[in-house]
A protein has these predicted regions:
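Carbohydrate-active catalytic/glycan-binding domains of CAZyme proteins
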Residues: 37-295
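Secretory targeting and sorting signals
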Residues: 1-36
């Protein structure tokens, strides 16, 4: 009897010790947050002066709340002007699509460059807008779905005012040197620029600037990338443009917007693409409209 009782007591003591050790071990386990684990690069230009219209690459090791300069590439493309770069990593290489003229100069195409190291860039494609009487071709943004690489560019014609529309261009090869298009994103209304798309589940989400009201708008569709778009409302206050998104390690999305009136890139986060935190200023000296990608 005493032997069974002593055995039971020892069992309870051992169990208590094991539980205590497990609790202590659990308290010491470090689970990295997205902000600590997500290393990002941000491609941007610095302003309207001729010296600022070139490709700059910044790097973040805290999930994109602050950046430091990785490379002033001095890359300006064939026209000597590079603005609004969109960066993506694809098949082991980096690609940047960009606007080729200032916002006051006519542009009928966008260009694409590539790099293996983020420092040295080579232009590989010039993609015509394909729209009659093109006046401006702005802010080409990469969109990849199912291994297919697409670019969404904002195009306006000379024969109308306030008529920017988003058009989709599709890569014909894995080198991204040949492209088809344009295809219009039907339903997404007149005079929208800087359209950035992300698909979550069966829903495509577009974040775009209404160039008339100066608000960032959220649009969705469940039909296709090029049809059925419905306006779901505005984000933030007016005075921001160039929305772009990146997915963090914890599953959240981070949006960047360019506060073009007073300067600076601002950011917010969301777990569902519908509800967003308040904007906060990104530590990224000199940064303007650009995009981020996981390094």
């Amino acid at each position: 009897m005493r032997q069974r009782k002593a055995t039971a007591v020892r069992g309870r003591v051992v169990a208590a010790i094991v539980a205590a050790v497990a609790l202590l071990a659990g308290s010491l386990v470090w689970t990295p947050s997205a902000s600590a684990a997500t290393a990002l690069v941000y491609a941007t230009f610095k302003g309207d002066a001729a010296a600022d219209e070139e490709l700059w690459i910044y790097q973040s090791t805290n999930g994109g709340t602050s950046y430091s300069v990785l490379a002033d590439t001095n890359f300006r493309g064939p026209t000597g002007v590079l603005r609004d770069p969109s960066i993506v990593k694809y098949n082991g290489r980096y690609y940047a699509a960009y606007t080729v003229q200032s916002w006051t100069t006519n542009s009928t195409y966008f260009s694409i460059a590539t790099s293996t190291n983020l420092y040295n860039w080579t232009n590989i494609a010039t993609v015509p807008s394909g729209i009659a009487n093109t006046r401006f071709t702005w802010a080409p943004e990469f969109y990849i779905e199912g291994g297919v690489v697409r670019i969404i560019a904002s195009v306006a014609a000379t024969n109308c005012s306030n008529c920017f529309r988003p058009y989709v261009y599709t890569a014909r090869n894995t080198a991204l040197t040949s492209w088809s298009g344009p295809e219009q994103m039907w339903g997404l209304g007149f005079n929208h620029i800087d359209t950035f798309v992300w698909k979550a589940g069966s829903t495509w989400h577009a974040f775009t600037k209404n160039e008339t009201t100066k608000y960032i708008e959220h649009w969705t569709t469940t039909a296709s990338l090029t049809s059925g778009w419905v306006n779901r409302g505005t984000l933030f206050s007016s005075g921001y443009e160039g929305p772009s998104l990146v997915r963090l390690d914890n599953g959240q999305w981070r949006i960047y917007v360019d506060k073009y009136v007073n300067g600076g890139v601002w950011t917010a986060t969301s777990s569902d693409l519908w509800n967003w935190s308040s904007l906060s200023l990104v530590g990224c000296s000199g940064c303007r409209h650009g995009t981020a990608t996981v390094k």
